Amino acid sequence: MSNLKDFNWTGFWKDTDYAFESYIGRDVTDENIKDAEAELGYILPTAYIELLKNHNGGVVNKNCFINDDDDCVYITGIYGIDRDKKYSLLGEMGNEFWISKVKYPPIGVVVADTISGGHDMIFLDYRECGPTGEPKVVRVDQECDYSITPLADNFGDFIKNLYFSIEDITDEEFQSLSDVEKVKLLNEQEGIDFKRAMELLTNIGIDNLSPTLLSALGRMYNNTGRAAEAIDLFERIDEAHRDWSWYYRCGYAHAMLRSE
């Protein structure tokens, strides 16, 4: 089980007027949580309760979910438990609405919505664990006959795999990520803004880039027709880090340069 007790919430939430009106609820008490669980018929995971005590639902700045299976989903907000808020577990557009009215499968609890406007939703999936166990987090796609895609083994891991989108992340936020996280962010986002992505890397300083990041930037140069600059980056990578992808990308850059 992955909890959020020591999670850094700085910059996670987008506290706009819309968020306060439709998502963000009052501070929660243990009694509120027990009442919500009784109404829903499920024990809520510890990590979700920790989120509620930090922020009772809301719109997220870190809205891009990426996991190790290369699934990429863009989140709008995470539901709280204040029934007076439209987008909450017990609200007008809450769990009962999506399952009873929109006919999403009754596999658990709708915990977050996406930028699709209701055409795919994020669920706590209790099918394997039962109503008192630790649910997985899945995406249910209405447009694909309510197909179910696993996203994370638990809610804590789901939250920890939310990233800022390329368009919104600051240089400081990007540089605070590990190299693995940087590459994951750059590789998996749909419709990536190459100009901003390259800027994020070059602002670190070419001489400060690891072989992994040099390769990522070189690939972007290849994709934007900057073959000579790509070759220069690939040549900076030492022999020990030249795997099959290095030879492929470097060869591609040389072929592109010869064809100019």
Locations of regions flagged by a protein language model:
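Short coil/turn linking the two alpha-helices of tandem helical-hairpin repeats
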Residues: E190, M256-E260
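Solenoid-like repeat scaffolds
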Residues: T202-N208, R236-H241
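Structural register within alpha-helical repeat arrays
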Residues: K182, L217, C250-Y252
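Residue at a conserved register position within TPR or TPR-like alpha-solenoid repeats
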Residues: Y221, H254-M256
